[in-house]
Amino acid sequence: MMVIAGRIQTRPSTCGKEKFMKRMGMCIGLNADMVGEYKRLHAAVWPEVLARIQECGIRNYSIFLREPENLLFAYWEYHGSNFAADAAHMAADPKTQAWWKICDPCQQPLVSRKPGEWWAEMEEVFHCD
């Protein structure tokens, strides 16, 4: 998922701030020998992790797998006004950190990712409702 440099002690209030929806996509490689384990893990995501995802304004979240290349594509819709703060809030959660520690060995970050990224951000080039 997202790597945020540094730590934040408190979550900035979004009270009174206008919220918006933004479609987001990211991709990463999946180690060939970990495909089964990754699928097993995501068939039973921990409830605390799912709750934190919702709390941070992420909706309609899906992860797709492309085989035989073993590429993961994640899509979600962010409903909020400060994605960086919400991502940091998620990253500060001990249960989410434990989940990532289990999932990370399955993943192979793309060589072309930006510095500090685990999952590589993608540009939306087309959308049709």
Regions found by a protein language model. Name each.
Residues 24-29:
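Active-site-flanking beta-strand signature of metal-NTP-handling nucleotidyl enzymes
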Residues 10-20:
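Short, Lys/Arg-enriched N-terminal segments with co-localized hydrophobic residues
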Residues 56, 78-118:
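An amphipathic, aromatic/His-enriched active-site/gating alpha helix that lines ligand/cofactor pockets
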Residues 34-59:
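Short amphipathic alpha-helical segments
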Residues 21-23, 69:
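A general secondary-structure signal for short beta-strands and their flanking turns/coil
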Residues 3-5, 18:
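Acidic, Ala/Val/Gly-enriched low-complexity intrinsically disordered segments
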